[in-house]
């Protein structure tokens, strides 16, 4: 299949998503029932980002031109193990392999095995030969290369099975934010989006903030109030109640707006419903320290503006590993 045909199919997919017809709405509803974390709001947020950042004709064209893609590639079969922490989280890997001209065999997460499968089957209906390029499997074997995303534990498993092949293996990552103390209400509300979107389950969600000594948390806590409706989501509420009880039982100081906990901790990762914080005295030293932390996906307020952590562009490759360059060397 020629590059131009692949681009045209992606633009058809964009149109299908934008139309948001009854069929697609039903699929999204089914996905939200299958996984209680995949609310309609957050499925739509994922789709919006895909439409605007990944399937824009101009952005696709610039991306393709940057790598000088053409039809000369010798197709290899790339196995993709997808995560399932947020809706359509594996779309970018699918897109990279597809636009490169390679074939792919996808192992979907049981948490997110409805949305992407439907979209690819829809693409089959537009171009039947696509079935020769994209397939699904419950077990991956016999592929020429692998891209696998999972927890630190599953990464050891991936290393064992895939290390003898060309591979990208991704582990747990999270994101942090640095505040200077002079942020406006509008900026703090954007940071609140970076924290709360997808219930904080994404690797680009902010789970830890660094604030200057003497920081006043009142405005920050108030900015969280736009997500107070999380208290009505039973899975989130169960996590909040549990984490609150941990703080109380351990007699630890905490702050809360009754939906999100603020806890002083050195840990970068925080459990659902909790945001960790630490104080800093000198920002340059803090930045130098954070740049060497392999667990950090991005730093809101530094790498990306507040409110944009969940809006990665085509070239914002997970873990800083250029997926397209990897594929072009196969």
How would you describe each model-predicted region?
Residues 66-85, 137-142, 152-154, 260-274:
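Donor nucleotide-activated moiety binding/catalytic core segment of transferases
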Residues 1-79, 275-287, 296-309:
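N-terminal Rossmann-like NAD(P)+-binding subdomain of aldehyde/semialdehyde dehydrogenases
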Residues 63-126:
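Conserved small-residue-rich beta-alpha loop and adjacent elements
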Residues 109-112, 171-175, 313:
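Short, acidic/turn-prone active-site loops that include or flank metal/cofactor-
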Residues 77, 127-215, 271, 318-329:
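Conserved NAD(P)+-binding/catalytic subdomain of aldehyde/semialdehyde dehydrogenases
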Residues 61, 86, 153-155, 217:
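Glycine-rich nucleotide phosphate-binding loop and flanking beta-alpha elements
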Residues 90-91, 116, 155-160, 220:
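Short glycine-/acidic-enriched loop or helix-start segments at secondary-structure transitions
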Residues 199-330:
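NAD(P)-dependent aldehyde/semialdehyde dehydrogenase
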């Amino acid at each position: 299949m020629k590059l131009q045909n692949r681009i045209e199919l992606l633009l058809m997919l964009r149109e299908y998503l934008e139309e948001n017809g009854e069929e697609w709405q039903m699929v999204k509803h089914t996905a939200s029932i299958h996984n209680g974390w995949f609310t309609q709001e957050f499925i739509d947020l994922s789709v919006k980002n895909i439409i605007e950042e990944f399937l824009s004709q101009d952005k696709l064209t610039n991306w393709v031109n940057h790598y000088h893609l053409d039809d000369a590639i010798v197709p290899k079969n790339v196995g993709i193990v997808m995560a399932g922490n947020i809706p359509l989280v594996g779309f970018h890997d699918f897109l990279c392999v597809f636009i490169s001209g390679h074939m792919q065999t996808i192992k979907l997460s049981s948490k997110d095995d409805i949305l992407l499968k439907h979209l690819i089957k829809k693409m089959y209906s537009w171009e039947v030969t696509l079935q020769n390029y994209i397939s699904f499997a419950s077990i991956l074997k016999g592929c020429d290369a692998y891209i696998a995303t999972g927890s630190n534990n599953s990464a050891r498993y991936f290393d064992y099975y895939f290390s003898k092949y060309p591979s990208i293996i991704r582990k747990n990552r999270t994101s942090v934010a640095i505040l200077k103390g002079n942020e406006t209400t509008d900026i703090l509300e954007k940071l609140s989006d970076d924290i709360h979107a997808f219930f904080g389950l994404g690797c680009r969600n902010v789970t830890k903030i660094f604030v200057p000594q003497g920081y006043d948390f009142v405005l920050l806590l108030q900015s969280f109030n736009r997500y107070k409706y999380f208290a009505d989501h039973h899975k989130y509420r169960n996590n909040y109640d549990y984490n609150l009880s941990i703080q109380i039982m351990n007699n630890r100081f905490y702050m809360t707006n009754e939906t999100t906990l603020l806890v002083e901790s050195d840990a970068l990762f925080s459990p659902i419903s909790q945001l960790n914080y630490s104080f800093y005295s000198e920002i340059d030293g803090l930045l130098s320290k954070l740049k060497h932390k392999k667990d950090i996906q991005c730093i809101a307020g530094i790498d990306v503006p507040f409110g944009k952590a969940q809006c990665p562009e085509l070239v914002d490759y997970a873990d800083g590993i250029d997926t397209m360059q990897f594929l072009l060397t196969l």
